[in-house]
């Protein structure tokens, strides 16, 4: 089995990178790909950089060169569901863009032309994530994660997302681009992110303070999922 793992920022991948055995580094187009073994499973861990373009590029390199059987997107997110606190987990059952608008041509809000309205995570990976959450005693919410090239910390941006995607549980900047590329390659994916902030006018302050907490939670969950896939759980 080969597993692809992708995160945007140094803090989001550092803990997992340090756990990879026999690691080798490939650097291409601004992305870092660490290949090796995690709990005896072949993995490739990508640090893509921030935003949709960087995420799509990193995912394409991952899928084209490493050819994993599945992709896990890890990292942090801004919480929208009222029950979420810093360090809690969101598990995607679907992802959508919040900053795409071609509704003039009959598409749904967030739907890119000639693409699905949403990208659905593999049910087996969603179940795996939720089972891993339960074993770790974490709190998680499953649902819609929305992505866009904006850090949401203003009232207007938040109101737009809540009005357009009232069912959204979290917002971040890469997941839908990753899912979009996985869809193009027909590779199953799931997004498991930890909450670093609630998407409000103080979110930039809490993000800086709690990114490490979120990274610890999401990395711990990814490790648990890998161990389960390796038959160690």
Swiss-Prot record:
NCBIfam families xref list: MTA_SAH-Nsdase, PRK05584.1
GO terms of biological process kind: L-methionine salvage from methylthioadenosine; L-methionine salvage from S-adenosylmethionine; purine deoxyribonucleoside catabolic process
Catalytic-site annotation from UniProt: 12 (proton acceptor), 197 (proton donor)
Swiss-Prot/TrEMBL keywords: Amino-acid biosynthesis, Hydrolase, Methionine biosynthesis
Protein name in UniProt: 5'-methylthioadenosine/S-adenosylhomocysteine nucleosidase
Known role: Catalyzes the irreversible cleavage of the glycosidic bond in both 5'-methylthioadenosine (MTA) and S-adenosylhomocysteine (SAH/AdoHcy) to adenine and the corresponding thioribose, 5'-methylthioribose and S-ribosylhomocysteine, respectively. Also cleaves 5'-deoxyadenosine, a toxic by-product of radical S-adenosylmethionine (SAM) enzymes, into 5-deoxyribose and adenine. Thus, is required for in vivo function of the radical SAM enzymes biotin synthase and lipoic acid synthase, that are inhibited by 5'-deoxyadenosine accumulation.
Assembly behavior: Homodimer.
């Amino acid at each position: 089995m080969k597993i692809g793992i992708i995160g945007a920022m140094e803090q989001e991948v550092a803990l997992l990178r340090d756990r990879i055995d026999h690691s080798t580094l490939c650097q291409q187009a601004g992305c870092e790909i660490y290949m090796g073994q995690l709990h005896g499973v072949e993995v490739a861990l990508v640090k893509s950089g921030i935003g949709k373009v960087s995420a799509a590029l990193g995912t394409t390199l991952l899928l084209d060169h490493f050819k994993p059987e599945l992709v896990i997107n890890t990292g942090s997110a801004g919480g929208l569901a009222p029950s979420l606190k810093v360090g809690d987990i969101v598990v995607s059952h679907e992802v959508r863009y919040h900053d795409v608008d071609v509704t003039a041509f009959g598409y749904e809000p967030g739907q890119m032309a000639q693409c699905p309205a949403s990208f659905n995570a593999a049910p087996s990976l969603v179940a795996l994530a939720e089972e891993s959450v339960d074993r770790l005693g974490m709190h998680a919410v499953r649902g819609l994660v929305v992505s866009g090239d904006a850090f949401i910390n203003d009232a207007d941006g938040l109101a737009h997302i809540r009005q357009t995607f009232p069912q959204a549980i979290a917002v971040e900047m890469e997941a839908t681009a990753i899912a979009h590329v996985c869809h193009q390659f027909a590779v199953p994916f799931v997004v498991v992110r930890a909450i670093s902030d609630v998407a409000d006018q103080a979110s930039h302050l809490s993000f800086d303070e709690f990114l490490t907490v979120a990274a610890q939670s999401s990395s711990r969950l990814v490790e648990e999922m890998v161990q389960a896939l390796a038959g160690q759980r």
